Amino acid sequence: MEIQQTHRKINRPIISLALVGVLMGTELGANTPNDPIHSESRAFFTTVIIPAIVGGIATGAAVGTVSGLLSWGLKQAEQANKAPDKPDKVWRIQAGRGFDNFPHKQYDLYKSLLSSKIDGGWDWGNAARHYWVKDGQWNKLEVDMQNAVGTYNLSGLINFTGGDLDVNMQKATLRLGQFNGNSFTSFKDGANRTTRVNFDAKNILIDNFVEINNRVGSGAGRKASSTVLTLKSSEKITSRENAEISLYDGATLNLVSSSNQSVDLYGKVWMGRLQYVGAYLAPSYSTIDTSKVQGEMNFRHLAVGDQNAAQAGIIANKKTNIGTLDLWQSAGLSIITPPEGGYESKTKDNPQNNPKNDAQKTEIQPTQVIDGPFAGGKDTVVNIFHLNTKADGTLRAGGFKASLSTNAAHLHIGEGGVNLSNQASGRTLLVENLTGNITVEGTLRVNNQVGGAAIAGSSANFEFKAGEDTNNATATFNNDIHLGKAVNLRVDAHTANFNGNIYLGKSTNLRVNGHTAHFKNIDATKSDNGLNTSTLDFSGVTDKVNINKLTTAATNVNIKNFDIKELVVTTRVQSFGQYTIFGENIGDKSRIGVVSLQTGYSPAYSGGVTFKGGKKLVIDEIYHAPWNYFDARNVTDVEINKRILFGAPGNIAGKTGLMFNNLTLNSNASMDYGKDLDLTIQGHFTNNQGTMNLFVQDGRVATLNAGHQASMIFNNLVDSTTGFYKPLIKINNAQNLTKNKEHVLVKARNIDYNLVGVQGASYDNISASNTNLQEQFKERLALYNNNNRMDTCVVRKDNLNDIKACGMAIGNQSMVNNPENYKYLEGKAWKNTGINKTANNTTIAVNLGNNSTPTNSTTDTTNLPTNTTNNARFASYALIKNAPFAHSATPNLVAINQHDFGTIESVFELANRSSDIDTLYANSGAQGRDLLQTLLIDSHDAGYARTMIDATSANEITQQLNAATTTLNNIASLEHKTSGLQTLSLSNAMILNSRLVNLSRKHTNHIDSFAKRLQALKDQRFASLESAAEVLYQFAPKYEKPTNVWANAIGGTSLNNGSNASLYGTSAGVDAYLNGEVEAIVGGFGSYGYSSFSNQANSLNSGANNTNFGVYSRIFANQHEFDFEAQGALGSDQSSLNFKSALLQDLNQSYHYLAYSATTRASYGYDFAFFRNALVLKPSVGVSYNHLGSTNFKSNSNQVALSNGSSSQHLFNANANVEARYYYGDTSYFYMNAGVLQEFARFGSNNAVSLNTFKVNATRNPLNTHARVMMGGELQLAKEVFLNLGVVYLHNLISNASHFASNLGMRYSF
């Protein structure tokens, strides 16, 4: 019977359907009732899937095409299913002779084989022609073509309605749709039979459309039931770009490929197309099973749904790749990936476990095993380049939701990104990976626009959920995200990573739930107060939210625990207020790096940020600006670590710029302001060793008011530039203060003053003995005229500049012009009594009167302290305890002699440990002293140095300095830098010597081919030969197979003064024995070795990748042997210092450099042969040249950077050796070589290692003498394969360093 050969236009209405959306649910009825998607899924499962799955997945499984499907779903389907369809009649066709002869011939499959058993006719109800198995759709056709070869075309078999068709053509190629497409469908009747069509071929190529379970004709008559199409290939399944595969309601497509080649569907695959218009009103299902595809599964374009709530399922293999995925606005696609170990259930139904008991009246049925949901295996992946939704203008309350669900370990959406088509009433896209991770590389678009807005009156919603079942998955977005107006994004994951910037429009909601969230930059500045406010809802993050930069305007921020590197609060300088609200309790671990308040529009239209509540907020820096406020009054404590800088006042009615409950200025933090202070502190203010920088403007400075208590906490740290205590309050340009008026600096109900140690602990007894803390605080209240201290002057001996500076500070021109007249102040500290300071329980204030003038050496002065040790090498600075005006003038003034201030010696003196200075010099020398100065003083300050030496005894200090100096000497040594290369070279010397011994053999037992030896003697006389053995020896293995390829595993170690260096790697090469006019050995090699080093204290650790390459040769002249060798080496070293003591902790750092070497060697030896050349003794002498070097390096430390310039060295050596070789058999040997190597010349440069200004020069070693012994041998394993082993030991007779290396290798000769 002829079938249609002309292409027909498909003009029937089509829609999308799906099936497996619910297959990943936890259990029936367990989903959240308020979730419309899952609510619909439950109903859909019970009302549609269980009965309808019979015609799709279950029937496919019954014939083995979907084995391994979710077992619980399959079992449920089987419960609802009737018995499998049984054909009334089975027709069989077998391809006979001829079909197996022509592999390049093409056949028409229908005409050649099928037509005899397929009938066709007119379907009056549907007004169309259709085809069926001969004698009725309840029959089956089996086609046996398993021996057939060639290509078989099936084209135009349209409206094949059953029954079953099974074509076995395992050695042939099936080509579907050469001229026209094919349509496989079914008819629904009382039995609801399923049409099953199976093609088993070597290769399958789809050229034209394929329809599965489409209607026949108009569809007005009999409807389609269900159809399963199985395409099985042992090699390749491919569809062309114009070959569309359409799965209609009730369709299942099984793809089976047993090869590792991918299945490539370049044509569009459309799931859920419906047969007729009325079907748009009902759900639908369709399924693709790729679980039996061994290679990757590739869809170029996959569409799900058209104009209905289609549900589709893919039972996938390990890796599924989709180019473009189109989802209809209400469609859903579930991609189920195999669990670890595959789909096969670990538990099987076994009827034998439940035998029938005839004695019982009740019959016990077999146990049914139902598996629950599962996670995809760790290597399962779903890749989608571009995800897109399609929509129409249909209105529905709550809008429509499209969904993509999977259980893969990784769901990856590529650079094509995600597009959500939005229409009135709103659209939502849900992307969920129930058990694994989600990664989105591309952008999020609305209506194909980046930053596109939702349709007016609607919202566009993106939802991403990762690991909902496991609570341990990551959602990652690697591109910028632009959310336009009314576009919302929700992300649920254990860890959410946003590696691009996020830009929020008006009325936008960004919601994240999970354990932690990491953001780059978030810009929420486009929103306005009211309906246009944007929301950052991170309240569902249980641990911490990390944001690099957050910029807000009218923004609601719901966040509990955060670390924001920078918070920028802006009003966009518009004529309406913009207010940011942190609407959650922020707890006690939240932190902001920098708060930047940008200037508002006006007092009436300001901006600001408010915190609803919290226990503690730590801020590094705050920058205030007018008409923009920071209200943290509901946070119990706010701490400032670095800086508060005030701008001009904002004058906002009812709102002051910065508002706190309790505010703490931490150590090293500063607060800068002038005549106005836009600050409210309703609780306590604590200055914990910070600095309040006050700038005089218009003759005044502002007053800091604390609602309750103010605390001034200070220490005895000295300002290294002035010699004074570091001030807590510093008044700049104090000379401009209005005279004779009390200027209140701090006001509180109660002010307390506390003196603490450098590290915050209670200070020592010497300081605590002075109980007048208010007077001590006054020394931390400093007045400056430019950079010159006004309230106290210090004049050092022979220093007129100090007198001039004092005169400029107090406005005394005489002291500036004639400093010689005031030399009586040398060695004194003078107090300016014209300045009155107040520090009591409620007020801190200053009153600047007329500056006093020095008149003599005793009035208002005190002597600078002098050194009390026997050797007056250093000036001392100390706390003045018994000055003449100790409690009335300047108590506890720290005075110093500037030229020796800041030395490590002065710190020891202040600690009353002057004798330890001598110990330091005696045991560690000037180099140890300089190292201590660099680590403690130059890199920190005297206070830090004091803390370190207080915690360390003199003996510990010297021991640690000596260990550090030794380590730094080691670093500077070129011998250390090239140790890995030297060990690698030693290993190769052993291997090369073994190769030369092997190829120098002149002994053999190889006498098997005696006829060849006699042939070689033809026309010669024995008397004309030097030795008859020479003729026989020409048949030794080295002549028959003169070329060798060898490879060795090498290892070595070096021991030197407790340090340990090791190396392991491999070496390989090729060599040959040449027997022409010149008898010689030539070869080349290359090697790699990884070396590691650690010193005895484990404070220096190194790892290096080393390579070595070179050539070698030996020339024979009778018993004389001349050896030549040249090689080069390069090493890349990564080293680190790891000192465990606190004193040396600043030395801990890492660095990288390159080391290199070049070597040439030449030697001469003479062979003394015994026992027919079986034993050879060879003395030899030689010379060598070695060039060593290293590049410069600088460490990654910001505190004490270690650096070293490049180094280079040239070495000349002479050596003498004696070698014993023993040859046995035809190929085996053993040798031992012992000798002495002496350096006789060395010159080059070796730069010092530097720590800032501190330098360590490498120790210059004397010329070295080495003793060396090496031995090795070789055994034959197979005809051309040999095993060799060698060891070498090298000992430095000068430094007592030892080096050991060994090798194990193989050789192949040819």
From Swiss-Prot:
Report which gene this protein is encoded by.
Answer: vacA
Q: Which InterPro entries match?
A: Autotransporte_beta, Autotransporte_beta_dom_sf, Vacuolating_cytotoxin
Q: Which residues form the signal peptide?
A: 1-30
Protein's recorded name: Vacuolating cytotoxin autotransporter
Species for this entry: Helicobacter pylori (Campylobacter pylori)
Q: Biased composition, Polar residues: where in the chain?
A: 350-364
**Keyword Signal (UniProt):** yes
What's written under domain? The signal peptide, cleaved at the inner membrane, guides the autotransporter protein to the periplasmic space. Then, insertion of the C-terminal translocator domain in the outer membrane forms a hydrophilic pore for the translocation of the passenger domain to the bacterial cell surface, with subsequent cleavage.
Q: What does this protein do?
A: Induces vacuolation of eukaryotic cells. Causes ulceration and gastric lesions.
The record's annotation in PROSITE patterns points to:
AUTOTRANSPORTER
One Gene Ontology cellular component annotation held by this UniProt entry: cell surface
